[in-house]
Amino acid sequence: MIAIVAILAGLLLPGLGRAKQKAQGIQCLNNHRQLLLAWRMYAEESRDRIPYASVHGSDRSRDSAVWVLGQLDFDGANRFNWDPNLSVRKSPLWKYCPSLTVWRCPGDRSTVTVTGRKLPRVRSMTMSVWAGGYGGEAPQDLDSGWRVYRSLVDMQDPGPSGTWILIDQREDSLNIGNFYTDMRGYPDAPETMRFAYDYPASYHGRAGGLSFADGHSEIRRWVDPRTMPTLTPGQRSRFNAEFTPSPRNADIRWLQERATRRTR
């Protein structure tokens, strides 16, 4: 009898695991669609201006238009990790989408310990740095000459359906509100490609969620193992504070193609 139960468990458990993964993927897509709709509603009520991906380097007056404030890590003393009143509820998108659950992928199980209790972190999503930039300005420490989109009408190339806005970021590389797609190597020098601090999440079987300016969302399966380095729960990635060469990485190329274009 015990042997029969063991055999049945061996047959059923993988199927249950796949069903759970599929359900999480569906919820992830729904979260992205809801938050992207809030992003579009904000723009439509702000004379077409989109929110900033991160704070400006010196002008704090722009902070109210930053999509989310605060830097995440695994320190329980850092309230931005676990207190939504400091970040999520202060987001300019909150009034259009007043739900805490949509900010976090259901596959993200990262926590911080606060006075002996494990609390979930408030978000897993980040915004493309090329959608809004640093208070509307371009990044200064990466290859210059790439367009920062500041309004919906700016997104003519690659176009709304081909420009990703939100992405689920790996828990060990999650930091400020933007996701930094380094455009180095695009389109004709793939041997110089690299990650700049940020890595996409792969919570859905080597795949992660994204949403695009036209409102649709996708689960993208990553194909290069370098996009998915070993993760130690509760610890910052050693890649988080450095540029990491990743020549001819098809995942970087995919993100670059859907991030921005050269300024003209």
Regions found by a protein language model. Give the residues of each.
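N-terminal single-pass transmembrane signal-anchor helix
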Residues: 1-20
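Short, well-structured segments within or immediately adjacent to enzyme catalytic domains
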Residues: 28-264
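Conserved acidic
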Residues: 3, 7-8, 24-27, 47
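Aliphatic-rich helix starts adjacent to a transmembrane/signal segment
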Residues: 18-32
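Hydrophobic alpha-helical segments, especially transmembrane helices
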Residues: 9, 21-23, 41, 185
